[in-house]
Amino acid sequence: MKNPEEAADGKQRIHLRPGSLRGAAPAKLHLLPCDVLVSRPAPVDRFFTPAVRHDADGLQASFRGRGLRGEEVAVPPGFAGFVMVTEEKGEGLIGKLNFSGDAEDKADEAQEPLERDFDRLIGATGSFSHFTLWGLETVPGPDAKVHRALGWPSLAAAIHAQVPED
């Protein structure tokens, strides 16, 4: 169990349900240029039903009367995208998760209880290989934060690759 000092620091452990990755249904994602100031499920589908129009300049749609311009963005090669959800507190928090798949061999070991106040379980509800990135009135373009973030894996691989000796 964590001590009170760790609890005060706001540290949390996040446990991924690996089985949810295999069963994640394909999802169609839209990254909108807005904030949803709610920390609970929001009925976005009531307000955003994408009637996407294709033209020479890219994709067009509208959200609550505002014009949107968009583009399709692919997940970097070698990666997969997942839509993750946090399970409610207490839902399934019964023991230490076994990721090795050899539950029979580990059955005799004492299980460490998950801490209901600090641990979170997440699972995948959808998977994607691309998504639509929207901007207000203009296509986001290559300088968008999302494009820069998606470039990091290839940059990290390049700077950590071995340099051949001459």
Swiss-Prot record:
**InterPro entries, alphabetized:** RNase_H2_subunit_C, RNase_H2_suC
Which keywords fit this entry according to its UniProt record? Acetylation, Nucleus
Primary localisation category: nucleus
Q: Which GO terms describe its cellular component?
A: nucleus; ribonuclease H2 complex
Query: What is the protein's known function?
Result: Non catalytic subunit of RNase H2, an endonuclease that specifically degrades the RNA of RNA:DNA hybrids. Participates in DNA replication, possibly by mediating the removal of lagging-strand Okazaki fragment RNA primers during DNA replication. Mediates the excision of single ribonucleotides from DNA:RNA duplexes.
Q: Which family does it belong to?
A: Belongs to the RNase H2 subunit C family.
What is the name attached to this protein's record? Ribonuclease H2 subunit C
Organism classification: Eukaryota, Metazoa, Chordata, Craniata, Vertebrata
Gene name of the encoded protein: Rnaseh2c
